[in-house]
Amino acid sequence: MTESVPEKSSQRGVSARSVSAIPLYGWVDVLKRTWAQIQNDNVFLISAGVGFYFLLALAPALTAFSAIATLLLPPEAMRDLLEELARILPESTTALLTSQLDTVLRDRQQETALSIKVATGLLLSFWAAAAAVRAMMTAVTVAYRETEQRSFWQFHLTALALTIAAIVIGIFAIVAFVLIPLALTFLPLSGSNEILIRLIRWPVIIGAVMIGLSVTYRFGPSRRQAKTRWVTTGALAASVLWLGGSLLFTTYVERLADYEAVHGALSSIVVLLLWFWFSAVVAILGAEFNAELEHQTSVDTTIGKDRPMGQRGAYVADHVAQK
């Protein structure tokens, strides 16, 4: 059953075929509904569960990530990335990640690259790391107002594919992260090279986060896939918010809060879990935002040929918001 198209549709973008075609009044509607859905879907509570799975998947994810990345890049490349991330992450969190990465790399050097043990460990690492992706898939399914309809194997294979995609995107980001400074050294630049290199690196990180979120928003929910233009807006907004929020979070932890006095030896874990929770909130918020953008228009936002409302296989595409 479809909903009737609201009055003054031309002022609210009910016939918009792209995000850019939604007028100001429509954007106000989208933002209001996004805030309401954040509360209705208990996003902050759901994000705590997703953040917990992120923490559990940290070691397996680093194992899988480094196992592939070390085939393409030296270990120093990943340490360079952690040094840059230290600018937006609390010191205790960066130290914990660095320690875990060193352990993984040391274990890798003690084993034969083609051994059965390594291959088996890599597969298990993929599967364990996919637990966090499965949690995120469930969260974005809720954000898009859907219920899980996929079979057990379809759900888990999708999660595994998204996990592999995330690792591949991360590796390409690190390759670009390393190659950009090398390329700039051959250009006739002034003495401000160091500043320029550091500034150029950040769009690479933002781009990697945006691509990863776009893939998650498109393939993660249990629904017919949305067209690319209806997922990238939320991905871009979430990426920028994640970077800015991480900077503010780091400032708060290092200058205002004293988690070590309260949590003692567990302070690093607590801070890392809080950052994972914040990252999950931002990622789910991007999905909520995308969902309300689709909900604003009566035009088919799903892939393939245009279908009438009620036959699109996605709640927000099959219904138009009343306000």
Predicted ranges, named:
Residues M1-K323:
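Membrane-embedded alpha-helices and immediately adjacent juxtamembrane helical segments
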